[in-house]
A protein has these predicted regions:
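Well-ordered alpha/beta subsegment
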Residues: 241-260
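Charged, terminal alpha-helix-loop-beta segments
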Residues: 1-184, 190-209, 213, 225-227, ...
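Low-complexity, glycine/alanine/valine/leucine- and proline-rich hydrophobic stretches
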Residues: 214-242
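A short pocket-lining beta-strand/turn micro-motif at the edge of beta-sheets
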Residues: 206, 215-219, 247-249
Length: 260
């Protein structure tokens, strides 16, 4: 169920490398990056230290992760196909302490916490713990850690600010208009900045993406070719050309006429 719950491809459980065992190794097909999933059983253990240890382990042994992917997926993944800058660690537990929650509340930290709750009727509720919008940078508290320096040189947590930096006020305003229109479609839609674009997701399904350009925006719609109702023929079929974001249709935006 990993694909439905987290939007990830399962690679291997109990993956061992350099005398360390990773509970689950997964792959994010959208960001083209590996994800390490650890199941926390000790409520008082440090998620920061363990998280950076695993991130460092992956960066130092990239070939082993590539080999494992290709052997289990019968694929032909190459080192350059992977965006190592978006590697992350996810801790899963029945509950996290306030200290653990606060420890990962940094806007540029590639470590996530997910809580799992099981109820009497055998239903299971799985939810990620959100970081506050006012969260600080991890660089303010971890500058003297050797592992931190190694990891932060290669791994980057992308933000809307990164992708909007240097853009004109008109483009920023245009982005905000379309972003708000998308979010107003459903309260469960989330904003997920990637390396080259900003993705909008609902329950780990990618709805669309906005690629910020110099004079406008490209909207990529996550619909397969032949399945989009576009009677006015506003979109372009990009199923046979390279592009950012998921989906086979693109709409170039320079004003607000497509908002409705």
């Amino acid at each position: 169920n990993m694909s439905e719950i987290m939007g990830l491809e399962m690679i291997k459980s109990e993956f061992t490398i350099k005398d360390r065992r990773i509970d689950t190794l997964a792959f994010d097909p959208q960001s083209k990056s590996f994800v390490i999933i650890e199941y926390k059983r000790e409520r008082n253990s440090s998620v920061i230290d363990q998280g950076f240890t695993y991130l460092s382990l992956m960066l130092q042994n990239q070939a082993d992760f590539i080999l494992e992917y290709n052997e289990t997926q019968a694929g032909n993944l190459k080192r350059n196909d992977v965006d190592w800058s978006q590697t992350k660690v996810v801790f899963v537990s029945q509950g996290f302490t306030p200290n653990q929650r606060e420890a990962v509340n940094f806007k540029d930290l590639s470590i996530e916490l997910w809580e799992v709750k099981r109820y009497e009727n055998d239903s299971v509720f799985i939810t990620p713990i959100r970081k506050s919008h006012a969260s600080a940078s991890i660089k303010t508290v971890m500058q003297n850690s050797p592992e931190f320096k190694e990891v932060t040189e290669k791994i980057k947590e992308y933000s809307e600010e990164n992708l909007l930096k240097g853009k004109s006020d008109d483009v920023v305003e245009l982005y905000e208009s379309y972003k708000n229109a998308i979010l107003n479609l459903n309260t469960e839609i989330e904003v997920k900045p990637q390396k080259w674009y900003i993705s909008f997701k609902k329950a780990n399904s990618h709805i669309c993406a906005l690629e910020i350009q110099k004079n406008g925006i490209k909207l990529t719609i996550n619909v397969a070719k032949g399945h989009l109702e576009d009677s006015k023929q506003l979109t372009r079929d990009i199923s046979t050309v390279g592009h950012f974001g998921n989906g086979d249709y693109e709409l170039k935006i320079s004003d607000t006429k497509y908002l409705e």
